[in-house]
Amino acid sequence: TVGVQPQYLGVGPVPAVNQLLAQERLTINDINAVELNEAFSSQVIASQQQLNIPLNKLNCWGGAIATGHPYGASGAALVTRLFYMKHQFRTIATMGIGGGIGNAALFERWYGN
């Protein structure tokens, strides 16, 4: 969890995803799908452009405007959508939170033995 200045609310996912990728020594090209909570469509566009997320990897099943924005359950909704993407190995769930805060979580599919 990291953030930006509060006046730039909505783009908190940018430093959060960048920090996560650097920590794991990955690039956005190593990620198969990104679920970015869509409180506002302009926020998703700004974050997508700054992170260089290919459109075919971003909110593959629609964003929160299309699928719903459950108060207090956005993170669970993002992760659930990612878990149903059974053919994607590495995925990220990220969201901007009030005051410029952003968080991001990386998931890697485990196929077992």
What function would you assign to each model-found segment?
Residues 1-113:
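Claisen-condensing/thiolase-fold acyl-transfer catalytic domains that form or cleave C-C bonds
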